[in-house]
Amino acid sequence: MTDLSKKVRAWGRRLLVGTAAAVTLPGLIGLAGGAPTAGAFSRPGLPVEYLQVPSAGMGRNIKVQFQSGGNNSPAVYLLDGLRAQDDYNGWDINTPAFEWYYQSGLSIIMPVGGQSSFYSDWYSPACGKAGCTTYKWETFLTSELPQYLQSNKSVKPTGSAAVGISMAGSSALILAAYHPQQFIYAGSLSALMDPSQGMGPSLIGLAMGDAGGYKASDMWGPSSDPAWQRNDPTIQIPKLVGNNTRLWVYCGNGTPSELGGANMPAEFLENFVRSSNLKFQDAYNAAGGHNAVFHFDQNGTHSWEYWGAQLNAMKPDLQGTLGATPGGGG
């Protein structure tokens, strides 16, 4: 085979993969709000509160689901996927997370809303199918919300964790990169770890258009804008290593197991994001990182069954890293 033939075949494969992704990803990245699991919602009777937290940055109150871990307890912020709803956080809809972390000594914080937001401060109003609103989620999560929780719920404003799925997995890492005193722990589950690279901006734009009719350019500008690299976890590895942030990074390979998630969209998307996670691990190790747990299982699809299992598995690590005192909060 000639060099030219090899190049043609290589470009053909790339075009095929890119076309498949472009056709399939709208609604797939949003599968991070996918099918509910059998264990959806925690049992009634837990001390879960529904807070209305004022946000000057967003010009409205933001609903936050909250379960106390006791006075001066560290916080775990559980961040939702691209199709975040306005009634409940996806972690509550799809898992019994409040049950799992009851009396863990960790305060569980679930912000509600933020569809397609990447939990970022957007350049422009977030205009979609439901109209326009202001997205200043990074400001809310790193300033307004921790101040409110400290003043009203006796939650530590520092030494916290951010754990996110899909869209919010990269967000959790970025929050920790730029706010290291608040977030000493970041968990990323099935995220695209290099959103600024290659077709990332285009595919994210397609997915956001499908999940609410939003535009990626309203968020971070054109793909050439520095905001894309600023919000790229792989590019920000030096900050994470320098901060000595504790990381928990998970990604399956698109093969379902007995946990479930056996459907084409969930299988395709998990396989699609896996390579960016492997590259992230390589870059992290090359940068001298030594404070991370990587789980790249030989099964797992882009669905809540696997993310819930990871949240359960990381509980002792969260408690140890954040210095929780089990038994608090009820």
From Swiss-Prot:
Signal sequence coordinates: 1-40
Residues involved in substrate binding: L82, R83, S166, D194, F272, V273, R274, S275, K279, H302, S303, W304
Single GO MF annotation: trehalose O-mycolyltransferase activity
GO cellular component: extracellular region
UniProtKB keywords: Acyltransferase, Disulfide bond, Secreted, Signal, Transferase
Similarity comment: Belongs to the mycobacterial A85 antigen family.
This protein's name: Diacylglycerol acyltransferase/mycolyltransferase Ag85B
Name of the encoding gene: fbpB
